[in-house]
């Protein structure tokens, strides 16, 4: 099942200068009420599935599709709602309902910063929260401070597993986010859970070698570009947190061909 579209626990966050809780605006209260209402309307189906959220400035949809294919290769029933653009609360909860009816036990969803800021994901049980990257601000992207503030709404929802990019320039800020059960990282650093050892870029694809402890494995994708290596590593880290073998990870990533993806 594939869709394509154009709370507060502060112990892991930087301490504020004041102990006073920030005042919730009327707009935010309305957004949260709408999210709760839609969840109830559809019978709160996400409680019977595991929710994987991928956020970041770029690559969210690519990582989500990689994870979708990996889970399929692992024999899981999985639905994906993937876009590098925005997402509406009504669309998200309808997706959960249809995924549940289709028998899915995993939902993989992209979580853009504006949707997080607008409380689209309010009240949801997050199994995995993964961060791709933060690119330098432009006319269409927020500052690091506002981006971090938006992203924190996802990581304050007590995700069981957190996946972070050690190669990102803002990793020192994001490293404050930890999972209630597990935290994994990926990148070229020796300390990364999934370490990027080397990569080869071709005209019609990308190949990369990774390490998971003493286990070495290779992934190849139809997608091209240096950033694809990081996206594969992110997907591999998410899959590793779900106890999926490296062979299955490689198979799933190889199976993703964007030309074959159709909207459900």
Regions found by a protein language model. Give the residues of each.
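Short beta-strand-centered segment that lines the nucleotide-binding/catalytic pocket of NTP-utilizing
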Residues: 75-86
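Amphipathic coiled-coil/heptad-repeat helices and related helical stalk/stem segments
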Residues: 38, 91-92, 147-151
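Phosphate- and divalent-cation-binding pockets in alpha/beta enzyme and binding domains
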Residues: 62, 66, 115-117, 170-174, ...
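ATP-dependent NMP and nucleoside kinases share a basic, alpha-helical "lid"
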Residues: 116-128
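Acidic, Mg2+-coordinating active-site environments of NTP-dependent enzymes
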Residues: 47-49, 102, 108, 125-264
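Conserved nucleotide-sensing/catalytic segment adjacent to the nucleotide-binding pocket
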Residues: 89-115, 119
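Short, basic phosphate-binding NTP loop
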Residues: 2-55, 62-76, 94, 191-195, ...
């Amino acid at each position: 099942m594939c869709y394509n579209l154009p709370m507060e626990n502060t112990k892991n966050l930087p301490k504020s200068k004041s102990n006073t809780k920030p005042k919730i605006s009327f707009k935010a209260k309305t957004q949260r009420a709408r999210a709760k209402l839609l969840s109830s309307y559809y019978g709160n189906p996400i409680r019977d599935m595991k929710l994987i959220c991928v956020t970041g400035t770029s690559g969210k949809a690519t990582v989500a599709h990689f994870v979708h294919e990996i889970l399929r290769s692992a024999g899981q029933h999985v639905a994906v709602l993937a876009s590098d653009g925005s997402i509406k609360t009504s669309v998200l909860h309808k997706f959960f309902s249809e995924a549940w009816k289709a028998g899915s036990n995993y939902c993989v969803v992209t979580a853009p910063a504006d949707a997080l800021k607008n409380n689209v994901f309010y009240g949801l049980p997050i199994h995995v929260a993964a961060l791709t990257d933060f690119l330098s601000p432009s006319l269409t992207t927020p500052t690091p401070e506002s981006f971090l503030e938006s992203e924190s709404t996802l990581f304050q929802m007590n995700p069981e597993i957190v996946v972070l990019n050690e190669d990102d320039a803002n990793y020192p800020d994001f490293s404050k986010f930890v999972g209630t059960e597990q935290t994994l990282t990926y990148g070229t650093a020796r300390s990364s859970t999934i370490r990027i050892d080397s990569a080869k870029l071709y005209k019609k694809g990308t190949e990369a070698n990774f390490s998971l402890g003493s286990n070495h494995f290779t992934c190849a994708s139809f997608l091209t570009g240096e950033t694809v290596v990081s996206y594969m590593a992110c997907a591999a880290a998410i899959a590793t947190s779900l106890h999926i073998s490296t062979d299955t990870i490689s198979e799933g990533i190889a199976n993703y061909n964007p030309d074959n993806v159709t909207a459900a």
